[in-house]
Amino acid sequence: MNSNIKLFAFGLLVSAASLASAQQVLLNVSYDVAREFYKDIDAAFVPYYKAKTGKDVKVEQSHAGSSAQARAVADGLDADVVTMNTTTDIEFLAEKGVVAKDWQKRFPHNAAPTTSTMLFLVREGNPKGIKDWDDLIRPGVQVVVVNPKTGGNGRYAYLAAWGYVRKKGGTDAQAFDFVQKLYKNVPVLARGGRDATTAFLQRNIGDVLITFESEVESVNREFGANKVDVVYPSFSIVAENPVAVVERTVAKKGTADLAKTYLDFLYTPEAQEIAAKHYIRPSSDAVLKKYADKFKPIKLFTVEELFGSLSQAQKVHFNDGGQFDKLYTVK
């Protein structure tokens, strides 16, 4: 009898061990304000992957400022995939040999399943009367924004402000002066998008927050509806959300197929609808049309149109000694 019990217990242990080994774990290292979006994506992906392969999977998430995340992956954080909000952060990983050199060719739309844009969140009732970029340089207006050296949110905010001047017919010199005035109204630079939102809503810093369109849903969910008003400026920038497989990790863990399937899933109608529900603009025209009520028409320009590429913008504006360092004085 005792031997039977021992055999039964041993069998349970073997079964548990087999189940644990059968379940693959995928780590998605992502940007700061994508937590809720990827939480919903992961909840949908697990049953999708089970139905597709018959295998169980657990998806883990890591979120912080996109540039800080890229550096962490370069330094050894074992991400299976990276889902960022600027191409420069993935280019950085490609240069380090962590991501494939041709990463943009491995998935549709230059490996960007979704996009966003930059807009303004203001206090309920818009007490400072913020309507467009020009209002952000008025005396007495405090602007909360992410440090462009630590997060893609901050880089896009900076480039959107610069591009606004250029789209109105201004020169680069005029854009420099405008953006310099804007950053003089910034009391403190946030490290990441969620840090900026926390500063604005929990610490009550500033009159206006420049952030991704997707933060509207996050703010409503976390802090309650109608805590902020949304202001769409006359011009803003297309912010791509690129993705890539981390070749170094998947080669070591044997998760290449899982990682590719996960990123492929982001292009499915189901995932594209999840994006739209989070105010993230889907690459699918059909889904974008279906959720047209969520995305107010706005005049958008691309990075390529005004800056050549994000890599070029990085060199000119955000590298040490670049335009940002020249116009911003640490307070």
Q: Where do the language-model regions lie?
A:
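Extracellular/periplasmic juxtamembrane helices and adjacent flexible linkers that interface
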Residues: V250-K331
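Ligand-binding pocket segment of bilobal, Venus flytrap-like solute-binding proteins
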Residues: K168-S234
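Periplasmic-binding protein-like
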Residues: A112-S116, F178-Y183, A190-R191, F223-A256, ...
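N-terminal segment of the mature folded domain
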Residues: Q23-G151, A292-D293, Y328-T329
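Short helix-loop capping/hinge motifs at secondary-structure junctions, enriched
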Residues: G125-K131, T150, G163-T171, T249-D257
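Bacterial N-terminal signal peptides that target proteins for export
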Residues: M1-A9
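N-terminal signal peptide c-region/cleavage motif recognized by signal peptidases
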Residues: S15-S21
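Short beta-strand->loop
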Residues: V29-Y31, V122-E124, Q142-K168, L182-V186, ...
